């Protein structure tokens, strides 16, 4: 039996809902013999990572998958890399707005996802749901968490694997926002469930085209 911790943020930036939180609430508690535990985290500098750290310590998952909203994206975006910088375009939910600050002074400049990102992307698209590999998780709390969890694993939770997936707005979030893409909660749920199934079943990622020119 393997265990995965799946995190989702609370609403931020004036939104009333966050699709990341909505989708994790709908996840099953098990896939086969493997366990899924969900965790709501605040869209807040430092506190988000601290909450995950406590849960890793108590739950001892094999994998940690964090989900975040990326308004404006057209598909499910499986993130490749997290960078050691906080440069918040907007304030977080407690008014913090660090600019050009390192997340951890003793951390590497960047950490790569240790999840099978291309196998995840391939299987999601095979099921008729748009998905791609993303090479930037931004510089807001999503990247903060992606980097922070990878840092914690490198420093104190050796052997665990983690990564991050961004998802689009839900249709109800784009009312009055002309030409802004969205995805149904059903399709997001299918995509994230597939991602978890692949995380449980694929040890080594596949090799396939997934890069970008710029």
From Swiss-Prot:
SUPFAM superfamilies per UniProt: Pyrrolidone carboxyl peptidase (pyroglutamate aminopeptidase)
UniProt KW keywords: Cytoplasm, Hydrolase, Protease, Thiol protease
EC number: 3.4.19.3
Broad EC category: hydrolase
Subcellular location: Cytoplasm
GO cellular component: cytosol
Primary location: cytoplasm
Top-level division of the source organism's lineage: Bacteria
First and last residue of the signal peptide: none
GO BP of this protein: proteolysis
Active site, renumbered: 79, 142, 166
Entries under InterPro entries matching the protein: Peptidase_C15, Peptidase_C15-like, Peptidase_C15-like_sf, PGP-I_bact-type, PGPEP1_Cys_AS, PGPEP1_Glu_AS
PROSITE patterns (UniProt xref): PYRASE_CYS, PYRASE_GLU
Purpose of the protein: Removes 5-oxoproline from various penultimate amino acid residues except L-proline.
Protein family according to the UniProt entry: Belongs to the peptidase C15 family.
Subunit: Homotetramer.
PANTHER family hit by this protein: PROTEASE FAMILY C15 PYROGLUTAMYL-PEPTIDASE I-RELATED (PTHR23402), PYROGLUTAMYL-PEPTIDASE I (PTHR23402:SF1)
Name of the protein this chain belongs to: Pyrrolidone-carboxylate peptidase
Taxonomic lineage of the native organism: Bacteria, Fusobacteriati, Fusobacteriota, Fusobacteriia, Fusobacteriales
Gene of this entry: pcp
């Amino acid at each position: 039996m393997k265990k995965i911790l799946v995190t989702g943020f609370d609403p931020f930036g004036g939104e009333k809902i966050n699709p990341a939180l909505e989708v994790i609430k709908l996840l099953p508690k098990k896939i086969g013999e493997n366990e899924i535990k969900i965790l709501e985290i605040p869209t807040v500098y430092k506190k988000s990572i601290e909450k995950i750290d406590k849960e890793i310590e108590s739950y001892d998952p094999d994998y940690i998958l964090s989900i975040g909203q990326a308004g404006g994206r057209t598909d499910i975006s499986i993130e490749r890399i997290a960078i050691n910088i906080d440069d918040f375009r907007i304030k977080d939910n407690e008014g913090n707005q660090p600019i050009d600050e390192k997340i951890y002074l003793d951390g590497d400049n960047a950490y790569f996802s240790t999840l099978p990102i291309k196998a995840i992307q391939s299987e999601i698209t095979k099921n008729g749901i748009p998905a791609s590999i993303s090479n930037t998780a931004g510089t807001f709390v999503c990247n903060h968490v992606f980097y922070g969890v990878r840092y914690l694993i490198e420093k104190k939770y050796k052997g665990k694997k983690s990564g991050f997936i961004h998802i689009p707005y839900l249709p109800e979030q784009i009312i009055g926002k002309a030409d802004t893409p969205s995805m149904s909660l059903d399709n997001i749920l299918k995509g994230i469930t597939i991602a978890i199934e692949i995380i449980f079943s694929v040890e080594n990622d596949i090799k396939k085209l997934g890069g970008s020119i710029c």
